Structures are given as structure tokens and as C-alpha cells.
A protein has these predicted regions:
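Conserved, mostly hydrophobic/aromatic
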Residues: 9, 37, 105, 116, ...
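Loop/helix patches that line or flank the sugar-binding groove of alpha-linked glycan CAZymes
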Residues: 233-403
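Solvent-exposed beta-hairpin/edge-strand motifs
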Residues: 403-415
Length: 452
């Protein structure tokens, strides 16, 4: 099991230690692990599951004060977690327990961020208290979570820390299922396609995701989809992702929804999806192994893939490192996109106002094409302007560019901070690919023509 059966919230899982039967070994080895990761420039976020407990009758909460720590509907226990029970975060001592627990992990283990499982089961005031307490430890600690519940909760909807209420919180983020489903199709319909896999009329959904679910005058919500509302108050509240440990991997989803397409075309779709992810405003999140076309095979499944592998063996859940050598172009593409994003602060604007003032969508484009420019008037930005184009069509399109000469840093094959060539007036964007260009950036390194 993935570890969503919490018993003692403040104790490290023993199965990862060399000696789980001695508590000090668990503690010391986890601290050593985090220290080593920090020494290598890697921050550590922890998935926390305060929304339910593994057992109810035998839990320490229930034994301490029966029924106080759990929500009920009449004589029945509410099950907003989908796991048999849900904790009552709105009650003073449950709220205090959650706040004390995250502060303990932050101070004792130096955890850098907390990802709240089924955050919608928790009330808004508790999440505000979590943010306030962690700010006193370190304001840079991340707080984000799943902005939904796992079932019907007894907590009134207006009090739930769901995605649609996230604007009422400060510096607390939520996963964007809008960009997830917009890129690849619904996770609940294996055959449903998205922008990169051939679904028409997804342009507005992608534009909505590009601005991190914040208000923008050029985004028409009625065309973006039923779920799309400006739920994000600031771009940092939108956790953008295509796949995570839940549901099908990105590659497996494409294998099912686009089974009739060639593997080469599905690789293009994967690259285009990653380009949308890493050039959108907000916080990019990726599943480990996505850069190597991670798959979760399951011969017993009707599709051949595992979409809910919480209890599946290593044969399914392990990262197939041997496959990296077969898909180095995809791996290097992800590396290049990450490097480009890190190099350009205009892709990481911190306020909705900055996005509104600096990001302009191009008009008069072909169907299934999204394009926009960003003015370089963002603190730390080295380019005067950035242009981003996504082509969801199987065929090439031509897009007119603003005046001047542009350096191409990302195309359908390569990505990074080096110029792959220049364009002026207009540019051709290959089918199922992205093109990212910069203007007036002296930091761009030129790539020899034969290497472009």
C-alpha cells in the first residue's frame, strides 16, 4: 500500500528503514536522508493524510474521546475520504493536532512542504491555521493539496478547502485537474482525448491553464469547459500537472486513447503536453518517470495498464530505469524545458495582475492552436519578449510573429536555453509540437546549424 492508512501521524514509516523495530533507527535514517537531499539542493515535500485514519474503533483518537475526532451523519460516520471515515478538522483539538503535527515535521525533520491528501475534507479555517503556523517556522514552506473530497462529506461545502474555495486562502495551492484533463483528456474516461491527443475545441481550456486559473480578459470561461472557473487567486495556487501516482500515467493514457496512432506520434503528444506544462504560469508538478514515458503494466487489467496501483506490486509501480536509454530524446526534452523555465522568470509570475499586464494571447490563429507573448518587464527576466505556440493539429501551421528577430529555444524535437535558429515575420510550427521563442535575450547561446 502507498501509505494512505495512517495510524501514528508523527512516526516515520518503518519499512523504509534498515531496522523498523527500533524507533530511533527510523528517526535517524529519515533525518539523514532529508539532510543529504538538502545538501544536494533538493527540497523535500511530504504527503500528509490527516483526512482519515486506518481504523476507527481502534484509533488513538477514538480511544481518547469517542466520536469527537470524527464527523457523523446522525448515527453513521461520514465518509468524505472514501476510506470509511473522515476526521473533524473544524473541532478545536483535531485542528490543533494537525497544526502541531505539521509544525513538528517542519521543525524536527526540516520538511520543506506539505501536500494534503483530499484537502477538501479539511475546513478552510484549519488550512489557514496551518499556513499561519508554518509561516512562523519558515514562510517558504509549501502548502498545497487535492482540492476535492473522496466522497460526500458532512462538512458544508462552503467550509471545505476545495479547489473552488482556494481563493479564500493565502499561499495554499490546489492541484489543477483543469490542465490535467485539458492536455490529455478526462482521467475518468480512458478513451477521452485532450488538446495534445487530437480533441477539437480545447483552445480555451489550454489558455485558462496557461494563466493558472486566474482571471484574464482574453480567456472565455464559457468556452473553457464546465469545470473552469477562476478558482485561483494567485498563480502560485495552481499546481499544474498531467499525471501523478493516481490514475493512468501520461504515456499509458495516450496508449489507450490514441491506440491507432503511431508510437512516434504519441511521443510528440507527450512532448507537447510537457511543453504546455512547463511554459504555463503556476507551479509545475510531474510524476517521477514521466520524462522516461513511465508505464504501469498490468496483464490482469482489461486495458493492459494499471490506473489504480495503490496495492500493486513493484512489477507495476517501479520505475523502469532500463527504458531511459530508449527514450533519451524525451528525457533530454524534459531537462531542456525545466532549464528554460528556470532561466525565465516571466514564466513564473507571482501575481494575477502581472499575468494580466504582461501576457497577451495571439488572435486569428488556426483551430487547435494556442499562442501568446509575454513582455519581459518581469523582475529578473533576461528576454525582452517571449513567444509560445502550441499546435495540437497533426499538420504544420504558420503563425505570424510580432516584429523583430526571434531566437527559437524550443521546438518539437529539442528544448533548452540555446538558440536552435531564428525566425522573423512568421514561423512554421510542426504538427503536434510546441515552439518557444525569445527576443532580445543576450544570454541565449547559439547552436551550430548542423546541431539545431
Amino acid at each position: 500500500n502507498w501509505g494512505y492508512d495512517p495510524k501514528n501521524y508523527n512516526v516515520p514509516e518503518g519499512s523504509y528503514s534498515t531496522d523498523p523495530y527500533h524507533g530511533e533507527v527510523r528517526v535517524n535514517e529519515m533525518k539523514q536522508m532529508i539532510k543529504t537531499l538538502h545538501e544536494n539542493g533538493i527540497r523535500v515535500n511530504m504527503d500528509v493524510v490527516y483526512n482519515h485514519t486506518y481504523h476507527l474503533a481502534d484509533s488513538w483518537f477514538q480511544k481518547t474521546v469517542p466520536d469527537y475526532y470524527y464527523r457523523k451523519n446522525g448515527d453513521h460516520y461520514s465518509d468524505g475520504s472514501g476510506c470509511g471515515n473522515e476526521t473533524a478538522s473544524e473541532r478545536a483539538m483535531m485542528r490543533k493536532y494537525i497544526v502541531d503535527s505539521v509544525v513538528y515535521w517542519a521543525t524536527e525533520y526540516h520538511i520543506d512542504g506539505f501536500r494534503f491528501d483530499l484537502m477538501g475534507v479539511h475546513d478552510l479555517d484549519t488550512m489557514k491555521a496551518v499556513r499561519k503556523a508554518l509561516d512562523q517556522v519558515n514562510p517558504d514552506i509549501m502548502v498545497y493539496g487535492e482540492g476535492w473530497t473522496g466522497g460526500e462529506s458532512a462538512l458544508p461545502a462552503a467550509q471545505q478547502a476545495t479547489k473552488n474555495n482556494i481563493y479564500r486562502l493565502d499561499r495554499v495551492g490546489a492541484f489543477s485537474d483543469d490542465i490535467r484533463d485539458g492536455i490529455k483528456g478526462s482521467v475518468f474516461d480512458f478513451l477521452d482525448k485532450g488538446f495534445v491527443s487530437g480533441k477539437d475545441n480545447m483552445e480555451e481550456n489550454i489558455k485558462f491553464s496557461v494563466v493558472a486559473a486566474t482571471p484574464h480578459s482574453q480567456v472565455t470561461l464559457t468556452k473553457a469547459g464546465d469545470k473552469c472557473t477562476n478558482w485561483s487567486g494567485q498563480p502560485g495556487q495552481s499546481i499544474n500537472y498531467i499525471s501523478c501516482h493516481d490514475n493512468l500515467t501520461f504515456w499509458d493514457k495516450l496508449a489507450i486513447s490514441n491506440a491507432d496512432d503511431s508510437e512516434a506520434d504519441r511521443v510528440k503528444m507527450n512532448k507537447l503536453g510537457s511543453a504546455v506544462l512547463f511554459t504555463s504560469q503556476g507551479v509545475p508538478f510531474m510524476q517521477a518517470g514521466e520524462e522516461m514515458l513511465r508505464s504501469k503494466p498490468n496483464e490482469k487489467s482489461e486495458t493492459g495498464f494499471d490506473e489504480n496501483s495503490y496495492s500493486s506490486p513493484d512489477a507495476t509501480n517501479s520505475i523502469k530505469w532500463d527504458n531511459k536509454g530508449n527514450v533519451m530524446d524525451v528525457y533530454e526534452y524534459y531537462k531542456g524545458l525545466i532549464a528554460f523555465r528556470k532561466a525565465h522568470s516571466a514564466l513564473r509570475m507571482t501575481t494575477a495582475a502581472a499575468i494580466q499586464n504582461n501576457l497577451t494571447f495571439m488572435t486569428g490563429l488556426d483551430a487547435n492552436v494556442v499562442a501568446y507573448t509575454i513582455q519581459g518587464e518581469v523582475q529578473g527576466e533576461t528576454a525582452q519578449n517571449i513567444a509560445v505556440i502550441y499546435n495540437g493539429n497533426p499538420d504544420a501551421v504558420t503563425v505570424n510573429l510580432p516584429a523583430g528577430t526571434w531566437d527559437i529555444c524550443v521546438n518539437g524535437k529539442k528544448a533548452g536555453c540555446r538558440s536552435l535558429g531564428t525566425a522573423e515575420g512568421s514561423v512554421t510550427v510542426e504538427g503536434i509540437s510546441a515552439l518557444v521563442l525569445v527576443q532580445g535575450d543576450d544570454t541565449v547561446n547559439k547552436v551550430p546549424a548542423e546541431d539545431a
